[in-house]
Amino acid sequence: MLADMATKVEAAKLLVYKAAMKKNEYAQGKKVSYSMEAAMAKLYAAEVAMEVTTKAVQLHGGYGYIREYDVERMMRDAKITEIYEGTSEVQRMVISGAMLR
């Protein structure tokens, strides 16, 4: 379980780095699109954050729900990322639209 969690977090990081690299290329004047990569990074990172923190809370048992433990706060923070950066459905629409262009 821990290995799967670490692998998903690392994959999410790589998607974020790729989107940032594309955005940087765009900022340097290259004619590249970065909206699909950004949407993929937002979608995957938000979903992985929620999945991994939920598993972390479960691994901690009852202590995972106590406010004194960081894992409880991390799960709350992960939940808001699913909403704040645009819902998963919106990100999927952005990705699909970019693929169809």
Task: Cite the ranges covered by each PLM segment.
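Alpha-helical interface subdomain recognition
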Residues: 1-101
